[in-house]
Amino acid sequence: MMRKTLVIMAAGIGSRFGQGIKQLAKVGTSGELIMDYSIRDAMEAGFNHVVFVIRRQLADEFKQIIGDRVAGIVDVDYAYQEISDVPEPYAERFAQRTKPWGTGQAILACRDLVDGPFLVINADDYYGREAYVKAADMLEKVSGKDKGLTVGMISFILGKTLSDNGSVTRGICALNPDGTLNSICETKNIVKTEEGAGVQTDEGIVPLDVNAPVSMNMWVFPQSFMGVLKERFDQFLSALDQEDLKSEYLLPILIGQMLEEGRVAVQVETSQDQWFGMTYQEDVPAVKEAIRGMVDAGIYPESLY
């Protein structure tokens, strides 16, 4: 039986979240994390292998808080995202760097743990059950052979991904007539408005289509994508100034570049579910309330374990 792998990116540092590690915030009715619900939804959709991408210094705490209990219900592996995990010529060149390299390198960290198509998600995002069903179906459709690279993306409705507590950055997607991805525009400073959504600028708010599809870093890749990631990471590093200690190797930007070059086709399925996450510390009560509501509605049990 093919392993259906869920890769959870949990190594990032939430610069706007405040105190604590947002991936480990307890939001469930019995102290569960958002990841617990993601894993439960993924398993119900047929996923049977979880790879946590974490920071090595958090390993013991991570396993104690969530990893060990998840290992009781599904196969679990750990990948460690390390700043020093770069091709040999660049290790010394960027020795002063302290900022993680971004989502592209996070996926590369699990290159030896993934043996088939896989789904990538953020640890601190709740995507909803529908998204995992769509993603599981996409595992059969992605490929890196014959006519080139085909990957998948689950998009969400912009208006269902906003925060009441500040601005957010979203990858706003333009689709082709056949439903494939045409482009992603990383858009910062998106806020809720009375009309729906807009971009906060110095001149005021520029309205956005509240129903536009957006990327929330929920990607489906063939195993062969690891080779592409490795090759492109080398190119990214070779073009980077030695003094630049902040630029990141990011999945949406990489996919956008490959789309422009005609090197990839991205199949898109849009989930109608409400997304929620924790960009800000102030988002936590709303997440807890949303989960409480789903428990009361019978979508989840009072305790997942």
Question: What is the meaning of each model-derived region?
Answer:
Residues 14, 126-128:
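A short, conserved beta-strand element in the Rossmann-like catalytic core
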Residues 2-67, 74-76, 81, 116:
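N-terminal glycine-rich phosphate-binding loop and ensuing alpha1 helix
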Residues 230-264:
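A C-terminal functional module that forms or caps the active site or interfaces directly
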Residues 70-117:
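Short phosphate-binding loop-to-helix
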Residues 129-219, 223:
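Conserved core of the sugar-phosphate nucleotidyltransferase
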Residues 87-98, 166-171, 282-286:
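Short, surface-exposed amphipathic charged segments that create phosphate/polyanion-binding patches used
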Residues 116-126:
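Short beta-strand-to-loop acidic/aromatic patch adjacent to the donor-nucleotide binding site
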Residues 265, 275-305:
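Hydrophobic helical membrane-anchoring modules
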